[in-house]
Amino acid sequence: MQVILLEKVANLGVLGDVVKVKDGYARNFLIPTGAARRATEKAVAEFQARRAELEKVQAEKLAAAKAQGDKLAGKTVSISQKAGVDGRLFGSVTNADIAESLKALGFDVVKAQIRLPNGPLKTVGEFPVSVALHTDAVVEITVAVVGEHV
């Protein structure tokens, strides 16, 4: 299916690109989230008329994400979990736990924006974690997992 992108989509294209994607990806993800529209002649003409407005909205989103990223960059979030004597946690620290801690500090972050490259954190220590506030605004924070010894 041919779609026209209404925003930047990772590994696919940028605003205004007409790309061919699988029908299910377009129908179930891109179109419902507002990231794309079917690339009919009418839709392409309508997009060209609104292109400047859409580019302005995208630039504002990016500026807001970068501003939040500047405040968030380099922060250390401390999370305490029950742990054994050897430093392994009973359970794990997930992206939802990190997002909850960031919300407590006043940052508007959802769990889907937290990137844990090696999966959930299962040991005590400090770990670098990426937070993708926008496709072009990714910042690094440090998560300090503190063990509550049982």
UniProtKB/Swiss-Prot annotation:
The lineage of its organism: Bacteria, Pseudomonadati, Pseudomonadota, Betaproteobacteria, Burkholderiales. GO terms for biological process: translation. This is Large ribosomal subunit protein bL9. Pfam families: Ribosomal_L9_C, Ribosomal_L9_N. GO terms for molecular function: rRNA binding; structural constituent of ribosome. InterPro entries: Ribosomal_bL9, Ribosomal_bL9/RNase_H1_N, Ribosomal_bL9_bac/chp, Ribosomal_bL9_C, Ribosomal_bL9_C_sf, Ribosomal_bL9_N, Ribosomal_bL9_N_sf. Binds to the 23S rRNA. Belongs to the bacterial ribosomal protein bL9 family. GO terms for cellular component: ribonucleoprotein complex; ribosome. The keyword RNA-binding applies. Keywords: Ribonucleoprotein, Ribosomal protein, RNA-binding, rRNA-binding. Gene3D superfamilies: Ribosomal protein L9, C-terminal domain, Ribosomal protein L9, N-terminal domain.
